A protein has these predicted regions:
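N-terminal, charged/glycine-rich beta-strand/loop interface patches
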Residues: 2-276, 287, 291, 348-351, ...
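Redox cofactor-anchoring modules in respiratory/redox and cofactor-processing assemblies
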Residues: 261, 289-373
Length: 452
């Protein structure tokens, strides 16, 4: 009888556990944000079905969070999503189905950190110069460069200032932006949240409240993309530092998120890329370093040239639709990008039937019996400098495809290109990879679907 009771109790517990398990969603709507720290120990949203869809209302990155000391990572990305079936050592394929800018205006510019307002890192550990509080709550009082004030002592608290800044109005058709003058910037600043369209759950101070207007009448074409898109690192870190360049700020840092170089290389997933080709139509294959992957999104930009050379571009709110798929037993050190064909380097674009025919004829003339059937792949690398980032991309590609680094260098030179994602240290190493190799590493079907 006692044994029967134990069995019954066990069955009841198992039954309760089963009931409490949330059912995986086919479509998940995301409008919640982290406090700037990507922490694998925190509960994720979801679960989402393998093959499911994420629709996210993202909030601006960079400047807004940088002006909000309670956000401890420099960005305000979405809470990570748990993808059903994703295990450590797998990969998650993310297809960007659509990106829509919702902001009507934004402000940006080149930054300079203010030395008495942070400890070690102005993105992570802000200190009020008045009352000395760490991560102080703030309010926006009025408009202009001194508008961000400590809630406790009313001291100006923003850890950054703009050395040259602008306010840009955005075309409602999503095609153009124009920088406005002093009066236009003032008009936008006085109705800041309405113009920025920050989601209701976002806590950032709107950057347009600063009303910068150093550039007036500058036209810019809109081509929105995601500066942050990826999976959760396996150790808690500030979201904007999830890459080898900004992540280097964490090495030996005087705050709780300090890393060694070895830890950074092991745990980061390079979700903060700022690669302008991560736009509608592109696919990215991301490493899974925690159970469920933890897909997160943010830092949408209205436009950007390669390098984001000013340090910041036009941060906007928007609506993003993604489709995710788990690739089992595809272990990656960092992301792989499959850009739209028009975004590929000339040398890496898929060959036409006519080009292949002519290549076969030339090969036969010199006794080459078979030419490669190959597809373009962009391997992302990051590091403290662009040189280190390039070395990282080449090293990752060599390990993944079981090639020597000199072979990768040759292939990237004649069938691809090294392109800057972000200065100082994110690049893509793009080159044509043989179909046989892609099949061996289990990513051929994903790449064929993108380019076939």
């Amino acid at each position: 009888m006692t044994n029967d009771m134990h069995v019954l109790e066990k069955e009841e517990v198992e039954s309760d556990d089963f009931i409490q398990q949330p059912q995986a969603a086919e479509t998940l709507f995301v409008n919640e944000f982290i406090d700037g720290i990507l922490d694998p120990s925190q509960k994720m949203l979801g679960p989402l079905k393998d093959g499911g869809t994420i629709i996210a209302n993202t909030t601006p990155g960079c400047w807004g969070p940088m002006l909000t000391p309670t956000i401890r990572g420099g960005h305000e990305v979405t809470k990570p999503v748990f993808v059903e079936g994703a295990e450590v050592g797998d990969a998650i394929v993310i297809k960007i189905k659509s990106i829509q800018v919702t902001s009507l205006a934004t402000s940006s510019g080149h930054d300079e950190a203010i030395v008495d307002r942070f400890i070690g890192d102005p993105f992570v550990s802000v200190k009020c110069p008045g009352c000395g509080k760490l991560h102080p709550s703030t309010v926006v009082k009025g408009i202009g460069p001194h508008a961000i004030r400590c809630s406790t002592c009313d001291t100006e608290t923003a850890p950054f200032k703009m050395t040259n800044g602008y306010t840009m109005a955005l075309d409602h058709k999503g095609q153009m932006g124009v920088t406005v003058g002093r009066e236009g910037a003032r008009r936008i600043a006085l109705d800041a949240k309405n113009y920025m369209r920050t989601p209701e759950n976002s806590v950032q101070n709107p950057v347009v409240a600063l009303a910068p207007s150093d550039l007036v009448g500058v036209l810019a074409r809109m081509r929105p993309f995601l500066g942050q898109l990826g999976t959760t690192p396996s150790k808690a870190m500030p979201d904007s530092h999830n890459a080898g360049d900004f992540g280097s700020f964490l090495i030996g840092a005087p705050h709780e998120y300090a890393f060694t170089q070895e830890e950074l290389d092991l745990h980061r997933t390079d979700g903060h890329m700022d690669i302008s080709r991560v736009r509608e139509g592109a696919t990215i294959i991301c490493p899974v370093k925690v159970p469920g992957g933890g897909v997160y999104i943010g830092d949408m930009h209205a436009m950007q040239g390669d390098g984001e050379i000013a340090g910041h571009t036009t941060d906007v709110a928007g609506i993003v639709q993604l489709q995710v798929k788990v690739l089992k037993k595809v272990a990656l050190e960092g992301p792989i990008l499959l850009p739209n064909v028009e975004d590929l380097p000339y040398t890496a674009k898929p060959f036409t039937k006519e080009e292949k025919r002519r290549a076969r004829e030339l090969a036969e003339e010199f006794g080459v019996k078979q030419v490669e059937d190959a597809f373009p792949v962009s391997v992302i690398g990051s590091g403290k400098t662009l040189n280190e980032a390039t070395d990282n991309a080449i090293s990752r590609a060599a390990k993944l495809f079981e090639m020597s680094e000199p072979e990768v260098l040759n292939r990237a030179t004649i069938t691809g290109s090294i392109e800057i994602g972000r200065h100082p240290g994110v690049v893509t190493a793009t080159f044509q990879v043989p179909k046989t190799v892609l099949k061996k590493v289990r990513i051929y079907k994903t790449i064929k679907k993108q380019y076939d």
